[in-house]
Every structure is written in structure tokens, then in C-alpha cells.
């Protein structure tokens, strides 16, 4: 790819639902391999990549709470689901000979390294893809919030939020054909309009740290790398 990237260090947020593909549950290895291929292309362009994966394809803590269960326990189960997804994506990356490390917010030394900013920056300096697992390590915080937090800690120039659609819309375009697509928004506009991009805490944290959010379709092959070079189709959230 001849075009030069406009970002040198980014955080990719991929939902657990994206990893399950057309399946109703679990991990579609072909999808994990495709996402890994996009990340590998970004690395070939010299872009440093951190990744946060959700766990909704396996478990959601809020589902427990909605049925009368303990939200804290449910969130802990959801955090463990993100570790499974992180290991799956790491496996797909290693099949492509991409040096990858999984850092977990929950200590589990026999499975992966524990998260710290120092470890993150060290692994990035060695050219490794860093996958962050375990969310923030705290209940009541989403993996979107974890993405914004890790992006700030690693000094990311942008958060790339891979979604089911090609940007931010005024409503769910799959349910409302009249939904309007936005090409560009500010963080404040996202919050004021109540747009379902990331949760309020995540958008606010990104705004406070002047980190743009790039929303694109995770299902578009090469979409991630095209946007890295200024092409592709996405909505950019920035105050600059």
C-alpha cells in the first residue's frame, strides 16, 4: 500500500458481536482472521496498534442484572469473555506472524500478562500489537470506556470504533431508513444529540484528552487501512 498513514498510533475497538459474524454466539474464526489481516496491513504501514475487544458475543453483565442477578458478578463474567476474545484475535494475528501480546486488567499470569501503561509502551516500542483484555478491570464500566481509557494511556492519536454500519447515524439505519448519516461531528455534538456511538463516559474521556473517534464498518474488508490513509467511509468525531 503506497499511501502514507495519517495516524501513527491508534486504538482499535472491536465489539464482541463483530467477532461472531453471522453466528448467533461465539467466535467466527474467519471473521477474527479478517480483522487480524486488517491489523497486519496497518502494521505493515508502520502504524502502532492497540486493540480493545468486547465480550458481548459470549456474555453481557447487564443481562444478569436485568434478570435480578448481581451486576458486579455479571460484569466480572463479561470481563472474562473479553479475555477469550482477546486470545482468539491474538491467535489469528500470530498465524500471520504478527508479534502480539495480550494485556489483561485482571491478573491471570498463566494466561496473559497484566496491564500497565509501562508494559503497553514497552511492547508498542518493539512493534507488537497490544490487545487489551478485561475491560477496565472494574464493574459498571463498558469496554467502550476501556477503549477510551487505554487510548489515553497509550497516547493514541485516534480511537477507531468498528461497528455494524459505516459511520454515525441519527438513528439505527437498519430500523429507520430515513436515518441521516454524519460525516463529521464534535464530541460535544455526539453527547448533546445522544448519538449511540460509544457510551457517555467514553466520549467524555476522549473529549477531555483530545482524542478523535473514527467510526467505521468493521465488516468492510480493508476498511480500517483505507481510513488510516485518509480514504474509506467513516464518521470522524473531533473538536479540532
Swiss-Prot record:
Allosterically activated by GTP. Inhibited by UTP. One of its GO terms (cellular component) is cytosol. One of its GO terms (biological process) is UDP biosynthetic process. UMP binds at residues 55, 75, 136-143. Its EC number is 2.7.4.22. GO terms for molecular function: ATP binding; UMP kinase activity. Keywords: Allosteric enzyme, ATP-binding, Cytoplasm, Kinase, Nucleotide-binding, Pyrimidine biosynthesis, Transferase. Pathway: Pyrimidine metabolism; CTP biosynthesis via de novo pathway; UDP from UMP (UMPK route): step 1/1. It is found in: Cytoplasm. NCBIfam families: pyrH_bact. Homohexamer. This is Uridylate kinase. It comes from Sinorhizobium medicae (strain WSM419).
Amino acid at each position: 500500500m503506497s499511501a502514507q498513514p495519517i495516524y501513527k498510533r491508534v486504538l482499535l475497538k472491536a465489539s464482541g458481536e463483530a467477532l461472531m459474524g453471522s453466528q448467533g454466539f461465539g467466535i467466527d474464526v474467519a471473521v477474527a482472521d479478517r480483522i487480524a489481516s486488517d491489523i497486519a496491513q496497518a502494521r505493515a504501514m508502520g502504524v502502532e496498534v492497540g486493540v480493545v475487544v468486547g465480550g458481548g458475543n459470549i456474555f453481557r453483565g447487564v443481562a444478569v442484572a436485568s434478570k435480578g442477578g448481581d451486576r458486579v458478578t455479571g460484569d466480572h463474567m463479561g470481563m472474562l469473555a473479553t479475555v477469550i476474545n482477546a486470545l482468539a484475535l491474538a491467535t489469528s494475528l500470530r498465524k500471520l506472524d504478527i508479534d502480539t501480546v495480550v494485556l489483561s486488567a485482571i491478573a491471570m499470569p498463566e494466561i496473559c500478562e497484566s496491564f500497565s501503561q509501562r508494559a503497553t509502551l514497552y511492547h508498542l516500542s518493539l512493534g507488537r500489537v497490544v490487545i487489551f483484555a478485561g475491560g477496565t478491570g472494574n464493574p459498571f464500566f463498558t469496554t467502550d470506556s476501556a477503549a477510551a481509557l487505554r487510548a489515553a494511556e497509550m497516547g493514541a492519536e485516534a480511537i477507531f470504533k468498528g461497528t455494524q454500519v459505516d459511520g454515525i447515524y441519527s438513528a439505527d439505519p437498519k430500523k429507520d431508513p430515513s436515518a441521516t448519516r454524519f460525516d463529521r461531528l464534535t464530541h460535544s455534538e455526539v453527547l448533546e444529540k445522544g448519538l449511540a456511538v460509544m457510551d457517555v463516559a467514553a466520549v467524555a474521556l476522549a473529549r477531555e484528552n483530545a482524542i478523535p473517534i473514527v467510526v467505521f464498518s468493521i465488516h468492510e474488508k480493508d476498511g480500517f487501512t483505507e481510513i488510516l490513509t485518509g480514504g474509506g467511509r467513516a464518521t470522524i468525531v473531533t473538536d479540532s
